[in-house]
Amino acid sequence: MDTEYQQVNKPWNELYKEVTLGNKLTVNVGMEEEEVLLLPSNFLTKVRVSMSGGYITVRRVRIRIIPLVSRKAGVSGKLYLRDISDTTGQKLHCTELLDLGKEIRLTMPHLDFSVSAKSDVPIAFGFEELVSPFREGRELFSVSLRWQLGLSAQCYSLPPANVKVMYQEDALKALKPSKKKASRTDSSV
């Protein structure tokens, strides 16, 4: 599958002005993940496309990630799309490690995945290996999705959703050594 990566270099203030808040998306950074379906459950009532063999493909998936933290914060992670139609949760695509302090646009022309026209499309997205210095509750970035189905020229989208830290053990560990260093300097004075 071909994927195009485009890092957009813009000043942070300009990026922040572009952010529009939509429905909230919560992604757990720890042991569990909460995912948002790529397609609405009632998509068959809205989509009219020619289907061969009763299966339909998802194509031209475009994902835009807009940071809600400073570029210097060091937030990074891998974005994945996976099939959640069964327990295996096969990954359809996983990016390289992305710097989530910059605006990122991902384009996936074709997913190696088709689904029965009589069921929901069980494709979900999430983040793994997410690293950030922030504690729970901090919103890190906004994600918006657009996609097309089969041969249809019509484009579908989800409103921008903010991803926030729910659990970040690494961030808490990183804070402890800095407190020790501060206490050492205080005792030496």
UniProtKB/Swiss-Prot annotation:
Compartments reported by the entry: Host membrane
Biological source species: Cymbidium ringspot virus (CymRSV)
GO cellular component, one term: membrane
Keyword hit for Lyase: no
GO terms (BP aspect): transport of virus in host, cell to cell
Keyword terms of this UniProt record: Host membrane, Membrane, RNA-binding, Transport, Viral movement protein
Lineage per the UniProt record: Viruses, Riboviria, Orthornavirae, Kitrinoviricota, Tolucaviricetes
Function: Transports viral genome to neighboring plant cells directly through plasmosdesmata, without any budding. The movement protein allows efficient cell to cell propagation, by bypassing the host cell wall barrier.
Protein name, as recorded: Movement protein
Pfam family membership, one: TBSV_P22
Molecular functions (GO terms): RNA binding
Family that this chain belongs to: Belongs to the tombusvirus/aureusvirus movement protein p22 family.
InterPro entries in the cross-refs: TBSV_p22
Keyword Membrane in annotation: yes
